[in-house]
């Protein structure tokens, strides 16, 4: 099986000319207003990273903690892509657009120290969240010819990827859950409690789980993901972890195995093939 997967990897990544991504700011009026003394329209922002080759497929990405991208311009994409940020050319080569997703303007509040003040589980699990994302999907379809949509979350972003997968059903082609959060934040259970007993069997579209086997973050235990995964789990091995064990440079975020993890995700999107382990 490993030699077959290797051949597939060559098909997608071998001898491909360099491709580029063009960042495009997207804003959707979600049809509601916010404000106390004066009302203003609520907008859902995203950044489309559009490949230089034609594509009809996009991966909507929700970042890890704080979970709020705070998008102001099209240049805010890199700090919000976690371990995918240095491998966007691989998506361009595969003909997959990346869409960096933010929380809507009425849920977009972050305190010093990267502490979210909004966009918690109440919003992420709601029909309103799914409706807001539908607005972006509609813009991608009508403006850029995107008809195949996948949703991915990393760490706290998996609150969105799981609930959107449930609430959008077959409106999307699949969902990817990286370093899934399954234990609520100990300082505020409104961040993470909704997925402590989440029913993964309720998801209609295909599902991929990817998790480092030595993830040490207390909110994202590997054993829990193993327990609910079937044949749809990629276990990442090896690499190196530095800094915060729940941060962007540790094994929690595929430290030292970022490229291999990215390639495995792309391979699943293109072929539905799951590599049981990578990084050995």
Language-model-detected regions and their locations in the chain:
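The feature captures the conserved acid-bearing segment of alpha/beta-hydrolase catalytic domains
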Residues: 174-238
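N-terminal signal peptide c-region/cleavage motif recognized by signal peptidases
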Residues: 12-14
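C-terminal catalytic histidine-bearing segment of alpha/beta-hydrolase fold enzymes
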Residues: 231-280
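Short, surface-exposed "cap/lid" segments of acyl-processing enzymes
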Residues: 52-90
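Alpha/beta-hydrolase active-site loop
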Residues: 83, 109-143
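N-terminal cap/lid segment of alpha/beta-hydrolase-fold proteins
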Residues: 19-54
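Primarily recognizes the serine-hydrolase "nucleophile elbow" in alpha/beta-hydrolase
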Residues: 138-202
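Conserved alpha/beta-hydrolase
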Residues: 88-110
């Amino acid at each position: 099986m490993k030699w077959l997967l290797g051949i597939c990897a060559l098909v997608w990544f071998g001898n491909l000319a360099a491709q580029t991504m063009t960042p495009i700011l997207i804003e959707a009026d979600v049809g509601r207003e916010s404000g106390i003394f004066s009302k203003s329209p609520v907008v859902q922002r995203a950044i489309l990273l559009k490949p230089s080759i034609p594509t009809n497929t996009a991966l909507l990405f929700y970042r890890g903690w704080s979970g709020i991208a705070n998008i102001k311009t099209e240049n805010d994409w890199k700090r919000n892509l976690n371990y995918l940020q240095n491998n966007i050319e691989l998506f361009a080569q595969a003909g997959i657009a990346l869409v960096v997703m933010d929380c809507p303007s009425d849920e977009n509040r972050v305190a010093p120290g990267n502490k979210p003040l909004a966009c918690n589980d109440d919003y992420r699990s709601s029909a309103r969240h799914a409706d807001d994302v539908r607005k972006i999907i509609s813009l991608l379809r009508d403006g850029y010819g995107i008809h195949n949509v996948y949703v991915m979350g990393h760490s706290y972003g998996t609150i969105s990827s799981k609930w959107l997968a449930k609430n959008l059903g077959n409106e999307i082609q699949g969902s990817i859950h990286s370093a899934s959060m399954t234990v609520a934040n100990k300082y505020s259970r409104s961040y993470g409690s909704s997925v402590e007993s989440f029913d993964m069997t309720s998801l209609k579209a295909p599902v991929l789980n990817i998790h480092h086997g030595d993830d040490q973050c207390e909110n994202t235990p590997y054993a829990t993901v193993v327990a609910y995964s079937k044949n749809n789990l990629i276990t990442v091995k090896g690499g190196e972890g530095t800094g915060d064990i729940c941060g962007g440079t540790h094994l929690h975020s595929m430290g030292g195995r970022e490229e291999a993890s990215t390639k495995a995700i792309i391979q699943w999107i293109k072929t539905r093939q799951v590599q049981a382990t990578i990084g050995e």
